Amino acid sequence: MSYGIIIQSRFSSSRLPGKALLKIKNKEMVLRQIQRLQHFIDIPIVLATSTDVTDDPIADLCKKHKIKCYRGPLNNLVQRLIDCAKSHKFKYIIRVGGDDPLIDPECCAKLKIENEKEKQDFIYASCREGWPYGCAAELISLNSLTRILSNTNDSFYLEHTIPYYFDNYKDFKIKKLPSPKNINRPNYYFSVDYEEDFKLINKIFEHFLPHKEFFDMKEIVNFIDNNKELLHINSNLHNGFTR
C-alpha cells in the first residue's frame, strides 16, 4: 500500500508573503521542514505547489535540492492533492502544511500505523487532540478526495479540503489521533502565520542548532516548558485558537 507525505506550500500569503522561503539560520523554512521529515521517517515526500508564476521560486528551490515537486491549481487544493497523489501512485496522503516547520515526524508515522490497523478515509491529529498547533498532520485517502471533488464545487471546500470531512462526517470513515501525553501542549502555537510566529520559530532553532540540527517534539516541548516567556512572542495573536 502506497503512502506519501504531501507538503502543501505556496508563496502567496496575505499575512506573511513568501514565508516558505524565509530563512532560518541561512536555510529556507520549507527546506528545514522537509529535511526534518527526511531525517526521522522513511516515507516519500512531495512538495505540492501551484502553477502560478508566484510559486516559481518554490519550484526552483525544490529543483536545486532535488526535492520532488508537483504543481497544480492555485486555489483548488483538492484537485492538486488528487493529481499529485496519482502522479506518485499514493493511495494514502499524509498532508502537511507548509506553514509548519516543526511538524512532528512521529505524528506522520503514527498516522500511517493507525491506518494500517484499519483503513480510514480520514485520520486527523490536531490541537483539539492535544497536539501543539503546527506540529500535527492528517491522513487522507485518495478515494475520499475523489469523492469530494465529485460531490461539491464549493470553492471553500475545494481550497481548504479538511472542513468538508467534518461537515459531512457521516459520509466517511474518520478517526482521531490523540497526542502522546509527554507532548500534550495544545496551547503551544508553532505554525507560521505572522512575523511574530516566525520569530518564535527562530528562537527555538537558535537554541538547538549550535549543537543539534534535528530535534524531536519532546525536546521542543521541554525547551518551551522551561522558557515559557517565549510564548509571549506570539500569544496575543492566537488567543482561543482552534483547529
Segments predicted by a language model, with ranges:
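Conserved beta-strand segments of alpha/beta enzyme cores
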Residues: 44, 68, 173-175
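Short active-site loop/helix that positions an aromatic residue
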Residues: 199-206
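Residues that recognize and position ribonucleotide moieties
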Residues: 14, 101, 138, 191, ...
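Conserved acidic residues
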Residues: 3, 43, 91, 121-123
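Short, conserved phosphate/pyrophosphate- and ester-handling motifs at nucleotide-, phospho-/glycolipid
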Residues: 194
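Conserved core of the sugar-phosphate nucleotidyltransferase
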Residues: 56, 60, 103-188, 203, ...
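N-terminal glycine-rich phosphate-binding loop and ensuing alpha1 helix
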Residues: 3-49
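Short phosphate-binding loop-to-helix
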Residues: 51-116
